[in-house]
Amino acid sequence: MAAAAAKAAVVLPRPVTFVTGNAKKLEEVKAIIGNSIPFKSLKLDLPELQGEPEDISKEKARLAALQVDGPVLVEDTCLCFNALKGLPGPYIKWFLEKLGHEGLNNLLMAYEDKSAYALCAFSFSRGPGAEPLTFLGKTPGKIVPARGPTDFGWDPVFQPDGYDQTYAEMAKEEKNKISHRYKSLALVKSHFKEAGYVFQTDDGTI
């Protein structure tokens, strides 16, 4: 029985490639994943895609797997304003670059509803040709005037429900227990644990 299970195991090159060029994002992923998934980071030039978050994340995983020729993990992050029916959503990066933190607040100036949610979509592909699996994490909150350090995206303007601090004001350990990224990665970790992947090195499997 054990031999049959071993034969059925999916063998992956070690480590998995996490595609990012963002040092802060990499720092958070390392803190959340720990040693549970062997991975390395790599910055790739992937096309900027449009569509729904899950579709964008999956397509990025397909493209990255082709470039890396191996297993990859990619992430797409959204900040969605309920008053704007989900915008900026996956386009938050460009909204932030053009408008800044104050501009993001100004988008909601005419609305009483300041509620929003942070959404993280991690997609994992075992390699070229494999259908990516996507894991979604969502944290509800609201948009507030910027507070805290301004060195990590829109963190200063997002205050999660149940807290009086913005993401930027929170201790890293606290944020990493409740964030959209944490929730998505918790599902990734569960998948890897359940799948029982075997990682292969040049010297054989471990």
Curated annotation (Swiss-Prot):
Pfam families: Ham1p_like
UniProt cross-references to InterPro entries, sorted A to Z: ITPase, ITPase-like_fam, RdgB/HAM1
Single GO BP term: nucleotide metabolic process
Record's cofactor remark: Binds 1 divalent metal cation per subunit; can use either Mg(2+) or Mn(2+).
Main location class: cytoplasm
Catalytic activity reported: ITP + H2O = IMP + diphosphate + H(+); dITP + H2O = dIMP + diphosphate + H(+); XTP + H2O = XMP + diphosphate + H(+)
Binding site for Mg(2+): 48
GO terms, molecular function: dITP diphosphatase activity; ITP diphosphatase activity; metal ion binding; nucleotide binding; XTP diphosphatase activity
Localization: Cytoplasm
Any one cellular-component term (Gene Ontology): cytoplasm
Key words, A-Z: Cytoplasm, Hydrolase, Magnesium, Manganese, Metal-binding, Nucleotide metabolism, Nucleotide-binding
Primary enzyme class: hydrolase
Cofactor: Mg(2+); Mn(2+)
EC number: 3.6.1.66
Binding site for ITP: 20-25, 60, 76-77, 93, 152-155, 175, 180-181
Coiled-coil annotated spans: none
Similarity comment text for this entry: Belongs to the HAM1 NTPase family.
Binding partners and assembly: Homodimer.
Function: Pyrophosphatase that hydrolyzes non-canonical purine nucleotides such as inosine triphosphate (ITP), deoxyinosine triphosphate (dITP) or xanthosine 5'-triphosphate (XTP) to their respective monophosphate derivatives. The enzyme does not distinguish between the deoxy- and ribose forms. Probably excludes non-canonical purines from RNA and DNA precursor pools, thus preventing their incorporation into RNA and DNA and avoiding chromosomal lesions.
Record-given protein name: Inosine triphosphate pyrophosphatase
Organism the protein comes from: Arabidopsis thaliana
